[in-house]
């Protein structure tokens, strides 16, 4: 349910977060 979505979002952010931050800083 809802908690599963939060867990998935958290896992995705852990994977993608650093790359997104790097991309944002480089702009």
From Swiss-Prot:
<keyword id="KW-0295">Fungicide</keyword>
<keyword id="KW-0964">Secreted</keyword>
<keyword id="KW-0800">Toxin</keyword>
<dbReference type="Pfam" id="PF07442">
    <property type="entry name" value="Ponericin"/>
</dbReference>
<keyword id="KW-0929">Antimicrobial</keyword>
<dbReference type="GO" id="GO:0090729">
    <property type="term" value="F:toxin activity"/>
</dbReference>
<dbReference type="InterPro" id="IPR010002">
    <property type="entry name" value="Poneritoxin"/>
</dbReference>
<dbReference type="GO" id="GO:0042742">
    <property type="term" value="P:defense response to bacterium"/>
</dbReference>
<dbReference type="GO" id="GO:0050832">
    <property type="term" value="P:defense response to fungus"/>
</dbReference>
<keyword id="KW-0044">Antibiotic</keyword>
<comment type="similarity">
    <text>Belongs to the ponericin-G family.</text>
</comment>
<protein>
    <recommendedName>
        <fullName>U1-poneritoxin-Na3b</fullName>
    </recommendedName>
</protein>
<dbReference type="GO" id="GO:0005576">
    <property type="term" value="C:extracellular region"/>
</dbReference>
<dbReference type="GO" id="GO:0031640">
    <property type="term" value="P:killing of cells of another organism"/>
</dbReference>
<comment type="function">
    <text>Shows a broad spectrum of activity against both Gram-positive and Gram-negative bacteria. Also has antimicrobial activity against S.cerevisiae. Has insecticidal and non-hemolytic activity.</text>
</comment>
